[in-house]
Design a protein with these regions (language model features):
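Trp/Phe/Arg-rich N-terminal binding region typifying the photolyase-homology
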Residues: 1-41, 143-265
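A charged, amphipathic alpha-helical module
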Residues: 21, 25, 29-152, 171
Length: 270
């Protein structure tokens, strides 16, 4: 079975972009030979133009979702994540985002607490479903796994644009890079709180959560860190999550976010 390994640099500089872009070009040439079909660079450029427009429209939708109640479920964010990673360069997906923009305008103003979610969404977990599925008091307005790259891409240099997008993805490099990007997202959407779900075994998420907490503390945004299994419901312990989440939401409702939120995190061993 043919296998291709892309060596993605951590450094964000022109030499790194050139290095990865050349790998992508070599991979494209290999695909041409494997499939017996010529590569059409103009189609790639067209897809990048659509991707740029889709990303802008998605941020427009996120801003509207921070203003209006838009009934949905936690799993909806995972569907959106799949679309952003598998269909972002297609006109059909851009049309879907534009439809959602017009649709959300018909819904009432949201008066509850706005949540920015970080990392995996355990959509099957009972307590999380209770508080975030079609709940007019608490609404997840966006998740970092949906828009893990915020770069405007240059369609005139498609391979370099793709290389730069990969290098600047929030999951590449140190966690401080992710913390800065989440901070930019928070500055745009103005959430009332951030919740990060640390999946068991994901050392990057667990180890870097303190860096993100410090970043958000500087922005006066309370943060809750939850631990659990984001994939296998057999390892889901609803009681612990229920206790910590309800205490955090009660703190948000009381309007004393930063001080009590810090105490809550310290009490949980974070």
């Amino acid at each position: 079975v043919p296998f291709t390994f892309l060596d993605v640099p951590y450094r964000d500089d022109e030499a790194s972009v050139d290095y990865l872009a050349q790998q992508l070009k070599d991979f494209t040439a290999e695909l041409e030979k494997r499939f017996g079909r010529p590569f059409d660079e103009e189609k790639l450029k067209a897809s990048i133009r659509i991707e740029n427009e889709t990303r802008k429209e998605l941020m427009r939708f996120f801003r509207l979702q921070s203003e209006r109640y838009y009934p949905g479920e936690m799993i909806s964010h995972l569907y959106m994540m799949m679309g952003m990673h598998l269909m972002i360069g297609r006109q059909e997906f851009l049309d879907l985002i534009r439809f959602m923009i017009e649709d959300i305008k018909t819904y009432p103003k949201f008066e509850g607490k706005k949540i920015l979610w970080i990392h995996l969404l355990p959509f099957y977990q009972e307590t999380l479903q209770k508080y975030f599925n079609t709940n007019q008091k608490y609404q997840i307005i966006a998740s970092d796994i949906i828009i893990d790259s915020m770069e405007e891409m240059d369609p005139s240099r498609p391979f370099h644009a793709l290389a730069r997008k990969i290098i600047r993805n929030l999951y590449n490099g140190s966690y401080s890079h992710k913390a800065e990007m989440v901070g930019r997202l928070a500055e745009t959407l103005h959430p009332d709180a951030v919740i990060q779900f640390c999946h068991w075994g994901c050392k990057q998420s667990s180890g870097g959560s303190v860096l993100l907490k410090e970043k958000l503390k500087d922005m006066n945004i309370p943060m809750l860190i939850l631990d659990g299994d984001g994939i296998d419901r057999r390892n889901s312990h609803d009681g612990q999550i229920k206790t910590r989440l309800e205490a955090f939401l009660e703190m948000l409702d009381a309007g004393d976010g930063e001080e009590e939120g810090t105490e809550l995190l310290q009490a949980s061993g974070r």
